[in-house]
């Protein structure tokens, strides 16, 4: 909720915390070990899907002790003419040449599967040596496209979540945990 009160705490807008800050930090260490093992002695291009994955990627790559290059891609989701289906569109492209590289795409959440399916489809045409995906959150119950991530931080219920990079109307990304936004705030009046 928009609030110019200096005593406002955005955690007050959270109905329920589903992944604590401590759980995130512990899982980052384990996820880093999994990725290090998978890419041992290989040069990896890590591609972050931003804005949502920016905090996750920043924290995760500090757990990696592999040879890596980092690039970012920005995706926006737009609705078809019938206003029912989101179509991912690349807003900012990567600069790395992926040909012959091992590629790891990192995103904040896998829910419908549309974004990661779209991005991996595009990247496959760039002839990488291998292509894997990593997500902080896997929300299986809403999957509309058959897609599985190779590395998963947490599997979560079908709830609208914010925090640790995930937003609602560009808010709540700064929260150190992941929580469910209070129901009355999920359809607020227009924020300025």
Pin down the residues of each PLM region.
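PRPP-associated nucleotide enzymes
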Residues: 1-192
